[in-house]
Amino acid sequence: MRRLNGPRVLQLVLKEAPYIATQDGDKELEVRSDSRWIRSRLIDAGTGLVREYDFVRYRLGYQAGAPCTVCRWGGTVWCDEDITVGPYRNGFRRTFSGGVWVIVNCFFRRV
């Protein structure tokens, strides 16, 4: 979690197709397979509770100067069921099996 002028910001990197769907406002959910890495960002190690954020900042890849999209964080939930996101206008679609983390995006704005 990184603070930008005070707000709590979850920073995530996306590949091109999911980034465009998020930037366009089509993709209201960010789904991540369960892993130690994503749990370290979503779960407070001290309390074991889901962390709360003000914003989610999505970055297109790792290159310097990569475009970013910021949206208001709408919550994080655990889902034990298979889930499919998409298809979106740009054709992106993905199915996740088993336990996944679902991050709700709200109020998109471009940065």
Residue spans for each PLM region:
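Structured alpha/beta reader/binder surfaces that contact nucleic acids or chromatin modification marks
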Residues: 2-111
